[in-house]
Amino acid sequence: KSGGIRASGSITAEDRQFWSFQPVKDVTPPAVKNGAWPRRPLDQFVLAQLDANGLSPVGEADKRTFIRRATFDLIGLPPTPNDVAAFIADESPLAHERLINRLLESPHYGERWARHWLDVARYGEDQAHTFQARMYPNGYRYRDWVVSAFNNDLPYNQFVIEQIAGDLLPDANGRLERLPALGYLALGPVYYKDAGCAGKAESDEVDDRIDTLCRGFLG
């Protein structure tokens, strides 16, 4: 309580060098000792850091281990015995690539990964934490929209725009399909408003929307 007031509006030259404020640019992958290990340019960055720390890549996982890891990671479910047997029997050099593509095309992929964004959006179909339980009977529409966005590979910029202003976009043809995206703003808490605290309750509701918007999109 006795500390000084932090100066506001003072951004130093050092602050401006923070990595997330830098413009995106092409970077040349670093040279590595084992040129046979990297399969993609990104692998060169990984291997360069391993080399710098005196570490070596582990060997490739066997196919049974690989399909279990990939399936749990991408769709959150174990592979079926038939899936495992088919993958092990597939001797094509494209077997791993085909497996990943199949998992990415699964509807379970969107269900698995949408849940992380739904946490950001503080998604819930009710407001049971208040003394007056309030249900959101159409809340599932926002959940389904997010799942669909992941499964249909909706570009991130469009993903953001539709959740903030999907009803204001000029394309009228897709307006009804975009409306559930506004659940990002609509599914927040709604407080009881009596004659003595209606103004504060409304302010708290707006504060929640601003907080969720800023935390979700601005960090």
Regions found by a protein language model. Give the residues of each.
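C-terminal capping alpha-helices of c-type cytochrome domains
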Residues: 1-4
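Short, structured secondary-structure elements
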Residues: 6-219
